[in-house]
């Protein structure tokens, strides 16, 4: 049973990585023809993070609006943990060492998210990643960060330990 669960974890993470790359490419392609003048669409990779919590303000607002309420407090924290890890990855995409650190942070955040909402995980993951990678330059930075660690071996926690990946 443990081997099949571990295999499921590896398969799921593999699908997520492929999904991330494909989504990033789609976002990059679709952004070129966009006529939107939204501030999010014209900002730098860093965007605005007025409260310096490591998450862009537009993403903070989205998380607070989408995952509001006491019942979603743990989910709100898990999504924000992932958003912070992705934002760090984008900002440090040119550094192999930092990309490896941030990739590990992203995996821990995804494990936390899977622990908090196993049935909704994929939908939430795709949704928040779309918010994070909402410009071609952000999508390119995400792909660059992943390219920095494509040969790395990042160990996954056993499923019964995913909740330990959650930051308070």
Where are these regions (language model features)?
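Calcium-binding acidic motifs and repeat modules
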Residues: 2-8, 14, 29-52, 58-168
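Sec-dependent N-terminal signal peptides
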Residues: 19-23
């Amino acid at each position: 049973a443990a081997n099949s669960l571990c295999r499921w974890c590896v398969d799921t993470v593999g699908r997520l990585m492929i999904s991330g790359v494909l989504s990033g490419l789609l976002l990059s392609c679709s952004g070129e023809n966009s006529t939107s003048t939204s501030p999010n669409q014209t900002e730098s990779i860093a965007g605005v993070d007025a409260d310096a919590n490591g998450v862009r303000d537009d993403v903070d607002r989205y998380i607070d609006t989408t995952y509001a309420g006491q019942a979603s407090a743990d989910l709100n924290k898990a999504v924000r943990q992932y958003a912070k890890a992705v934002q760090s990855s984008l900002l440090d995409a040119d550094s192999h060492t930092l990309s490896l650190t941030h990739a590990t942070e992203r995996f821990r955040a995804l494990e936390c998210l899977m622990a908090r909402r196993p049935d909704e995980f994929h939908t939430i993951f795709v949704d928040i990643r779309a918010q994070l990678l909402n410009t071609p330059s952000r999508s390119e930075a995400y792909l660059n960060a992943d390219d920095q660690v494509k040969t790395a071996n990042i160990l996954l926690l056993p499923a019964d330990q995913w909740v330990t990946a959650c930051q308070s």
